Amino acid sequence: MSRVRFDLDTLKRLAQFAAQRSSEDRIPQVAGSLTFTTMLSLVPLATVAFALFTAFPIFASFQMSLQIFLADHLMPAQLNSQIFNYLNQFASKAKGLTTIGMIFLFVTAVMTMMTVESAFNVIWRVRKARPIAQRILVYWAIITLGPILIGVSLSISSYLFTQSMTFTAAQRMTPVIEWALAGAALPLTAAAFTILYVYLPNCRVEWRDAVIGGVTAAIAFELAKRGFGYYVRRIPTYTAVYGAFAAVPLFLLWMYLCWFITLAGAMIASALPAIRIGQFHRPTFEGSNLFDSLELLARLSEARDAGKRGYTVPELSRMLRRDMGTTINLLEKLEEIEWIARLQEDGARPHFLLLANPAQITVERLFGLFVIDRAELGYQLELASTRVDGEMLLAALENDKLKVTLAALLTARAAARAAQAAENESGTSSMPHQAA
């Protein structure tokens, strides 16, 4: 019974953790923002991509394969014909633009991808984005080579599928084969989500976490597509109100669902390391960052004294019993003041080392870093609108006891442990005499 209770408590804390992460990452709000951005950049993206197929006639068949695949699998059948007709019309008109106009379209497409990358960096708690030159090169490769490679792959898949259908035309297919053929798009969708989660954030993402997030997002995407298609077909509310214009609001709603599923899958992939090590339910409190930063510095100090090369983020998260997002936030702030440094080796996770002398690391500095920003507080107290005396308040915050160092705290803790061990040992040795 206790095991069941433990599992239920764990599931409850896990649900609270998921709700907290969703609130912190602002998944619904970011999905709405990306929906609006996508509507503005959809024509530029389609124009840049389809212009490549037009410039090289050899790729014309690949373009048809890509359009057919997107029409069948990207959105419900009730919307794809109208939406792709609109896109083709807009893209064909955009081909007559001048060079400046095409540059503007490309910039718009790049800005969309930058928005998506920024959203992923927020979800993975990454503060430092890629250099702008590297980002533009990656985006250009995705925009130009992506449609061609996908078109080639789909053309080959279409050919193989046609050959298999011809081979089995005279035979009666079993329901298992029919189900397998109908779900052939699911692995491609899962692979696309997985690659997106691995390479788009500016951090190292484990493939196993990205695969779980990608498969979850792909399944949710297929279910949403079928459910949304059923809603449009059976409950024609938008058609009755908007008439022929109904495709636009329905497409907006579908784009919002797509982005919500994409971001939710990213949130799952980013939260899996914390869930896997079990550090997702420790409560935070006012001043917990101060305590955790001291504990983190103490661990790095012990590692340096032992001759170790420091610890990685997962190792520190496990020691602090905190999620990786909180640990990364602490490390970044301590790295900014040059108390710690990261050691990056090829293909490995970075290790963090202690640079500062523990005898010079004071609680007062950490108090100002994680609890009260005294510089900002002093500025606010100088404003004419304040009703409290700034000098008295700042003087009250001046406490010599906050000048205690990390070395003193470590020494005091070691002495307390030694005294406790000696007391336990003396108590154990006196037990036989008392029994006698």
UniProtKB/Swiss-Prot annotation:
Q: Which UniProt keywords apply?
A: Cell inner membrane, Cell membrane, Membrane, Transmembrane, Transmembrane helix
Signal peptide range? none
The keyword Cell membrane is assigned to this record: yes
Name a single GO cellular component.
plasma membrane
Annotated compartments: Cell inner membrane
The question of whether Mitochondrion is a record keyword is answered with no
- Membrane topology of this protein: Multi-pass membrane protein
Q: Which Pfam families match?
A: Virul_fac_BrkB
Transmembrane regions: 42-62, 96-116, 136-156, 180-200, 210-230, 241-261
Q: Which HAMAP family match?
A: UPF0761
- Similarity section: Belongs to the UPF0761 family.
| Database matches in NCBIfam families | yihY_not_rbn
Q: What is this protein called?
A: UPF0761 membrane protein Bxeno_A3061
- To which species is this protein native? Paraburkholderia xenovorans (strain LB400)
